[in-house]
Amino acid sequence: MINAFKYKLIGDKPIVKLEEILKQQGVENVKDFLNPPIDCLENPNNFDNIEKASQLFNKNKKRNVSLVVDCDVDGFTSAALIYQYLMRCEFVNDIAVYCHSAKQHGVSDLHYALSKDESDLIIIPDAGSSDDEYFNQIHQTSCVKKDILVLDHHLRDKKLPKECTTAIIVNNQMSDKINNKTLTGVGIVYKFCKYLDKKQNTNYSDDYLDLVALGMVADKANLRNLESRYLVLQGLNQINQHKNKNLFINELIKCKKFSIGNEVTILDLGFQIAPMINSTIRCGVMQENNAMFQAFVNSEQTMRMYLRGKGEVKMSMQEYARRICETLVRKQKAKIAKYSVDIIKQINESDIKNYPVIIADVKNVENTFTGLLANMLASEYKRPVLCMRANKGILRGSGRGFEKGSINDFNQFLTDTQLFSMVEGHPNSFGVSIDIDNLDIFLDKLSQMEYNPDTYYHIYNIFDNSLGQLTVKHFGKYHNVYGNGVDEPLFVVKGIICNKYNIKISPSQKAISFKWHNIEFTKYSRSPMVDLIDELDKCFESGNGNIEIEVVGKFKLGSYKDSAMMIVDDINIKPTDKCRLFGG
């Protein structure tokens, strides 16, 4: 028997209005949240050092610039924005672009090359706020005096002096007069370009709001903040009205048209577009990452690629980079599948499978796949996961929480043990390190905790089998509201009667669907749902051929004439003597 899911109603009564859903998630002013006013934008003048940064630009006008591209979507969009802005303003003579050869941040791996090149100004977007040591090395080993500009949103290391003396840093976290701490790297770059626009009487920065939207969504900026939400929605409006300027973003959206439909949303950027870019950053070689950056800056260069059945084909840089992304998405999936076989075997053969937290040794897994593997394991075991590898007495890796379990904030849970030397990131997605001597103490704590395998869903309403299309469509039409700090609402539907002829199972066994009252219910899985299919067979055999279904999931609008759908997160089934009338 598979574990049945359980649920708790949010609030003291069922919720039927969008306003109530949003208020339950911490939205105070629903009207402004849905349509953020322009006066929610903070004045760029309030950033510490922004005038110094502007003067740095003027000092280096018509000189050579080195640009560091940080290795995530926020980093690529940040660098692409400042690159295009500089070229458009004719600020510089030449820009040398540096992509990382591995998943590293800042200039720790690039400082020697940066010190030896011919640049006068080094620009580091979305990183560098704590790289004083490497900036010192650049200044000491460079033959010419170099200026360094950091445009970042990460917290500065508390061990360092408050002010950096070897670079100019513009950072919302380090600016007391800036209230919005949710801006990501691309948001900081946009605000800086907005400041430059005002100084030179231009209006270029808004042309890059599609990059701002993608980078901020991918970096999980909390969009309950009105300024951040305003910027993302403005970028999405440009995309949906076909007024945006970035050719590569358009190319990626075009290839995902079937999944996305007619309107690109916050969730689409986060779950359809960003993963394609991340796959290239994780799996791609330097040449492929450089090609993707050129696609991001609207390069007009053409490339050639061999296509099966067509031979060598000439194509735009944007199509070339998109095809690289698609290839590397498949490569990434294959690698995760390969790694997961050994890791799951390792877990199942140890006592850790009975603990409230899964800990996996990922010494044979490439660093760039650690977080993805942790995601997969958290979904597989329905509990928090630590994937770590040992190096010089320290275990380092990634942590992923499971919000439907008993530990709501895995980051805080680990921090409270005071055993971990580093837990940095989001509540349920972060980097982690622990002294290997502390691991046994942590395991002892886990062994004393009672493990509750129940999966609890926090839901907004419970519907019986009289549920109709209008209710589903009412909630489904707000699909463009959710994402990045505002979760899609979950609902329960009870009492659905099905027979085996109503259930459709995909050939891969990764999708199970059925219809009720012309509402399409579908459950997807990353792996074949063997246990659920076996349970379905047993229930059909033990009753009169009918089963009663209870589901929890999200209401959606289908792409075909806005049909009513529910994407099922979890399902309970049992045999029943009740009959399904007239096909439901």
Task: Describe the function of each predicted region.
Residues I2-L121, H139-K146, D197-D440, I462-D464:
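Hydrophobic helix-and-loop "lid/oligomerization" segment in the mid-to-C-terminal part
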Residues A80, F135-Q137, K162-E163:
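Short amphipathic alpha-helical segments
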Residues Q104, D131, H154-P161, D176-K177, ...:
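Short gly/pro/ser/thr-enriched loop/turn and capping motifs at secondary-structure boundaries
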Residues P125, L149-H153, V170-N172, M388:
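Generic beta-sheet signal
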Residues A127-Q140:
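Active-site core of PLP-dependent enzymes with the aminotransferase class I/II
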Residues P161-A218, G425-H426:
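Short alpha-helices
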